[in-house]
Amino acid sequence: MVDQATLDKLEAGFKKLQDATDCKSLLKKYLNREVFDQCKSLKTALGATLLDCIQSGVENLDSGVGIYAPDAEAYTLFAPIFNPIIEDYHEGFKPTDKHPPTDFGDINTIVNVDPSGKYVVSTHVRCGRSLKGYPFNPCLTEANYKEMEDKVSAIFGTFEGELKGKYYPLTGMDKATQQQLIDDHFLFKEGDRFLQAANACRYWPTGRGIYHNDAKTFLVWVNEEDHLRIISMQKGGDLKTIFQRLVNAVNTIESKLPFSRDDRLGFLTFCPTNLGTTIRASVHIALPKLAKDKKQLEAIAAKFNLQVRGTRGEHTESEGGVYDISNKRRMGLTEYQAVKEMQDGILEMIKMEEAAP
């Protein structure tokens, strides 16, 4: 049973959302009284309540989404609120839809999107993974964090070839290492206010760390927002090489450590926006003619299911005319389709840039 103190907090949070007329989050949009009453007295086997899901969105009324899953079970137990939010964000992924099985496809059909090197500064492909048998951040114990770090760092030690590198735990990190990782844009900081409010930063920095290969083209974040964020990147537009590296790494880790996957939702993540393939394939690209009008740039990108962000990612501005453009869709398509969608859209946008007056 959910205790009275939690129920009181839930009622207060619900009222705060209802009263916030300028709040535009998906949480506010779909958490009506009926849905709230259906969910407020439920608790997952690990003890997570609706409050754990919504407290960040209640505290931060400027959230875009406003909800997180404290553990895997939350997605099914609190389906009355998660399902409509997932359907809205992932553009029509209905409660009856099923995410397709994992398929990285034929890598040979992936190309260098900018062989001339004129437009694309760098290319990144990342995915998120959760370790099977462990909840997400708010429900993890200090011992869980250490145990997970031990398991993944042992696997890092077996990496060979271009994946070979070094693991840097955040605990006890010296200033010189820290500065080097900041200069490389590899270091992640303790979570922002959205993650803090979701209780995603407990026992910091225990169990958190960064692995990168010697060439600095492959990176794993351990226990940041998700258990694992696996990132492959390099200068230029050679999407094929970058995607191949990511696939090799994911397969290597998965052969030794099972990931948390749901038949309907695909790979499970802390935030519902990353479910499914969890893949975000992006380029840092300068398209000076198309970018003269940012609204127009966004409209063109949207035609190809692509999303435009500032140079440093979400909530940032463009620096030197360089934008971060990525695939928007993560659910209801395969990993291969997600990457191919980004590739095809960028190829078209470069053609349009070249044809522009």
From Swiss-Prot:
UniProt binding sites for L-arginine = 64-66, 225, 271
- At the top of the EC hierarchy, this enzyme's class is transferase
Report the Gene3D superfamilies cross-referenced here. ATP:guanido phosphotransferase, N-terminal domain, Glutamine synthetase/guanido kinase, catalytic domain
Q: Which SUPFAM superfamilies match?
A: Glutamine synthetase/guanido kinase, Guanido kinase N-terminal domain
- Record-listed E.C. numbers: 2.7.3.3
Q: Which reaction does it catalyse?
A: L-arginine + ATP = N(omega)-phospho-L-arginine + ADP + H(+)
> Known CDD domains for this protein?
arginine_kinase_like
Protein's job: Catalyzes the reversible transfer of high energy ATP gamma-phosphate group to L-arginine.
According to UniProt, the name of this protein is Arginine kinase
Q: Which organism is it from?
A: Polybetes pythagoricus (South American huntsman spider)
